[in-house]
Amino acid sequence: MKKQLRSSFSTQGRRMAGARALWAANGMKKEQLGKPIIAIVNSFTQFVPGHVHLHEIGQLVKKEIEKLGCFAAEFNTIAIDDGIAMGHDGMLYSLPSRDIIADSVEYMVNAHKADAMVCISNCDKITPGMLMAAMRLNIPTVFVSGGPMEAGELDGQHLDLIDAMIKSADESVSDEEVSKIENRACPTCGCCSGMFTANSMNCLNEAIGLALPGNGTIVATHANRTQLFKDAAKQIVENTYKYYRDGDESVLPRSIATREAFLNAMTLDIAMGGSTNTVLHLLAIAHEAEADFKMDDIDMLSRKSPCLCKVAPNTQKYHIQDVNRAGGIMGIMGQLAKAGLIDTSVVRIDGMTLGEAIDKYDITSPNVCEEAIKKYKSAAAGKFNLVLGSQDVYYKELDTDRAEGCIRDIEHAYSKDGGLAVLKGNIAQDGCVVKTAGVDESIWKFTGPAKVFDSQEAACNGILGGKVVSGDVVVITHEGPKGGPGMQEMLYPTSYIKSRHLGKECALITDGRFSGGTSGLSIGHISPEAAAGGNIGKIKDGDIIEINIPERTINVRLTDEELAARPMTPVTRERYVTKSLKAYASMVSSADKGAVRLID
């Protein structure tokens, strides 16, 4: 059944003369009145390298949409660079910005009655924020990301932002060497080149089905990234007419992002050792979609999904550009499908089922198309470059080696255990998360005395000041969604542990979270958090912490009676919290619920 255009409320009828006059002043031509209005939700900013190159692409998408008969209007959201906001109180604002982005998209699209959206996202909180908005609005939506940064290179070795952070804190590394690394770590526009949060989310968007193949892996500088934007423009027009003209609801976000799609996305995440932040975001997006997807599902999947792809920071051998050469996300999904670990019947924005998309785009498929070969041969140029789609370097050959290549088959998996795991115990009754792909197997079982800090800043000072020694478990409390507030990322503490050459000799646990750039025995999202009365807030220096990844447990060596009788450790830090952050803290839920706001 044909659907009424949402935009008709502001473009049709005598009483909308004023609104039509305003649309005309926005550039709408008379022949465009009554045609679908498609919002281009951009996120250009000169604060974030993952977004610095998006200033003109929105207008290219607009032109492509209007060639096909619709009207398009662009607006921007905010975007925070977690790397620049890291290590100081700026990180308090990162996670809350996800909800601000979701709200701002909802406000703009509903206020102006747009009929559909193209979401141009890229970095850490922008993609999940826009996805949350898409689920709320449930209008035809296509996502296309700005693409990953090329990996840096020094002395024939790849490097990235995390190398700069670790080496700068290592006193054995000279200032000259640090300067060389700093100048080569981030050579192009795009989101940071490892399987950090931004790239993880852009890859998961392919698995959910709201982005086209190549979205997560084609580098930002390549001409095929520009083609992806053109393809997204064509797709949103097609889907808009499918819904409003033909009444086809299969193109709507909630029809695509079903429970099965979230299970597929999480299976991919576990198989590629993605950022632990993805757990937080997928739970929040599923909450907005009203899809039945919970922490227990993640625990279940983590026990049966192997690790098929390892990328920085879990190894320095591969970066996202190498995943692209190996066939991208469809290459990993193809292996998961062969093992029966994903549901290939789910639908996608391109009208195909996941199974059909894998058949067409998996480079090991006998039916792989030429378009796929071209996408996945898109290479890094190896030059400093801040311009989107400005180079056309191609690999001569694809990486189809599923035994020893970047992407493995089930028989040659990096590990039978997946790249993420959910642990539970008397420290984390509602669960916590560890990226096992980044943990050396020699410390999957770890027991040690607690060194407790009530802030990230105190932990950094303690680590750099020599208070943390081999065998310790660093415990950072009161950094959860409510307690921070804002659930800061603990990338600096984990980087400083590595800089002190303790990466395989210490653990770190927190009710805060971690950057996708974190590796090592780093356990976050401990729920309930200290600010909600969680037992992590009762741990004292010297308490023995027991971590067992194979058994999925984390405990402090105290009886239930001892824990119940012990008071919360008082918070000694001084931290100024603004009214906006206090408002966030008053509404936010725990990490095991996705840190969504609880609003009646």
From Swiss-Prot:
Keyword Metal-binding: yes
Residue list for modification N6-carboxylysine: K125
Source organism (scientific name): Bacteroides fragilis (strain YCH46)
Coiled coil: none
Cofactor(s) needed by this chain: [2Fe-2S] cluster; Mg(2+)
InterPro entries according to UniProt: Dihydro-acid_dehy_C, DihydroxyA_deHydtase, DiOHA_6PGluconate_deHydtase_CS, ILV_EDD_C, ILV_EDD_N, IlvD/EDD_N
Active-site residues, Swiss-Prot/TrEMBL: S515
PROSITE patterns linked to this entry: ILVD_EDD_1, ILVD_EDD_2
PANTHER family: D-XYLONATE DEHYDRATASE (PTHR43661), D-XYLONATE DEHYDRATASE YAGF-RELATED (PTHR43661:SF3)
Protein's name in the database: Dihydroxy-acid dehydratase
Textual note on the cofactor: Binds 1 [2Fe-2S] cluster per subunit. This cluster acts as a Lewis acid cofactor.
Quaternary structure note: Homodimer.
Reaction(s) catalysed (UniProt annotation): (2R)-2,3-dihydroxy-3-methylbutanoate = 3-methyl-2-oxobutanoate + H2O; (2R,3R)-2,3-dihydroxy-3-methylpentanoate = (S)-3-methyl-2-oxopentanoate + H2O
Record-linked Gene3D superfamilies: IlvD/EDD C-terminal domain-like
Keywords: 2Fe-2S, Amino-acid biosynthesis, Branched-chain amino acid biosynthesis, Iron, Iron-sulfur, Lyase, Magnesium, Metal-binding
Keyword Cell membrane: no
Entry GO MF terms: 2 iron, 2 sulfur cluster binding; dihydroxy-acid dehydratase activity; magnesium ion binding
Pathway: Amino-acid biosynthesis; L-isoleucine biosynthesis; L-isoleucine from 2-oxobutanoate: step 3/4; Amino-acid biosynthesis; L-valine biosynthesis; L-valine from pyruvate: step 3/4
Origin organism lineage: Bacteria, Pseudomonadati, Bacteroidota, Bacteroidia, Bacteroidales
Binding, Mg(2+): D82, D124, K125, E489
Function: Functions in the biosynthesis of branched-chain amino acids. Catalyzes the dehydration of (2R,3R)-2,3-dihydroxy-3-methylpentanoate (2,3-dihydroxy-3-methylvalerate) into 2-oxo-3-methylpentanoate (2-oxo-3-methylvalerate) and of (2R)-2,3-dihydroxy-3-methylbutanoate (2,3-dihydroxyisovalerate) into 2-oxo-3-methylbutanoate (2-oxoisovalerate), the penultimate precursor to L-isoleucine and L-valine, respectively.
